[in-house]
Amino acid sequence: MKLFYYIIPFFLCFVHTAQGEENDTTNLRQVELDEVIIQSFKQRRDLRLEPLSASSVTGTAIENRNITGIKEFSSFIPNLFMPDYGSKLTSPVYIRGIGSKINSPSVGLYVDGIPYFEKSAFDFDFNEVDRIEVLRGPQGTLYGRNTMGGIINVYTKSPLKYEGTNIRLSNGNYGNRNYALSHYKKIGEKFGYAISGDFQNSDGYFTNLFTDKKADDMKSGSARIRLEWKPGKNLSLGLMSSFDRSNQGGYPYAVCDSATHTPGEVNYNDYSFYKRTLSTTGFSADYQGNGYSINSRTAFQYISDHQGIDQDFSPQSIYFARQDMKQRMFSEEVNIKSTTSGRYKWLFGA
């Protein structure tokens, strides 16, 4: 009798499974994803074959979303967060929770293969960006220091692949204005140049009761030139130079009421500000050999910024902080890597 009780549930499960298989008429749609190639200075491979988590955003998507800086990527790039602390000076980037608000960054930033070592240079105006890649996870093996959280690669449009003139004008409330102009020209098949510039303005959102003026107004402008030359079939040379100037008002900070835990009004007497001058120049050389390539990146970056902040956040003159910084950074990197489609690849560099 006990054996009979064990056999009946077995057959019931078999019949139920068979009926489920017969009644399942679901058709699953299979979609072949488009090929995405990592264009990094360190590597060039199909993103689908890479053992890492990455996101790639095209220039069209950037324009459609009206993205003007890295901070705005936080809304749709997984595991990427760049908080806004009130000025471009404090611009930490966090990937998977790894980042640094002070000292050296934990996420690396490269623009056309040129490294940006200082966090205060991360928050710059996007203009004519062709593509952005976010590589999540430690990248120290290929990129070295300050890449524990990941890497952000920004690529601008190439004058050898794109020609024309673009004009962008936008206006909004609170005095928000954005004007941009760019021109791309190819001379023959071997030389091309690109010139672009933009201006952004914001009258601010918070009023300082002491001065009766906006506390967080902002004006910024940038200019950029890019030259590309292919003197031979296997040799490519490039020169990039950019200049960025930002002038921001102070921080819309207010004293918090410890009893009600509510913020008070912005009301302080000393004028607060952040002013930054950023200049970056880079030279690139790439040679494609038979099964290998030799690549070089030379860069120089100059940063000069000035910060003043009323840190008592009150109408009284108690504590005012001033910070000035000037940095000159030079970098040189050369690598040689395999370009074959074999199972194994190699790379050497310094």
Each PLM stretch: what is its role?
Residues 21-61:
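Short, acidic, small-residue-rich periplasmic hinge/interaction motif at the N-terminus
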Residues 50-69, 94-97, 171, 229:
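Short, polar/charged loop or turn motifs at beta-strand boundaries
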Residues 70-73, 92-97, 110, 134, ...:
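N-terminal periplasmic accessory domains that precede
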Residues 71-114, 130:
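Extracytoplasmic beta-strand/coil segments of soluble accessory domains associated
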Residues 112-138:
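Short acidic/polar hinge/loop motifs at secondary-structure boundaries
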Residues 164, 171-202, 210-248, 277-281, ...:
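Transmembrane beta-barrel wall of Gram-negative outer-membrane proteins
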Residues 236-279, 305-309, 317, 321-325:
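Flexible loop and strand-edge segments within Gram-negative outer membrane beta-barrel domains
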